[in-house]
Regions:
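Conserved, structured core segments of small domains
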Residues: 1-105
């Protein structure tokens, strides 16, 4: 199944709103991961360089197609509550990295 990277930057001045809707956003991700069709492989907040402030979100998603990802984004509480500003979605091809302890063939 195709994979997608979702990179979302928060709008300026929304940190307190982000914090108030963070639990709803997390619940949405868990619900979607269980119900499908979009599976959340990895997710987490983007942060300032000092690690003190959340500034956006990064998600690695598995989905049947781009349309499913677009619906996923449209339904996320961070979209409804206008927390995310700029959102980019890119299809991603995972290339396994060989482990150092694996003998070459």
């Amino acid at each position: 199944m195709p994979m997608y990277i979702l990179h979302a930057k928060d709008r300026p001045g929304v940190l307190q709103r982000r914090l108030s809707f963070y639990a709803a956003h997390r619940a949405f991700l868990e619900e979607q991961d269980e119900a499908g069709p979009v599976r959340v492989i990895m997710s987490g907040p983007l942060q300032t360089d000092d690690g003190e402030t959340m500034t956006g979100s990064l998600l690695l998603l598995e989905a049947p197609d781009r349309a499913a990802v677009d619906r996923f984004v449209a339904e996320d509480p961070f979209t409804h509550e206008k927390i995310w500003g700029e959102v980019s979605i890119s299809r991603f091809h995972r290339r396994p990295r060989p482990r150092k302890d694996t003998p070459e063939r």
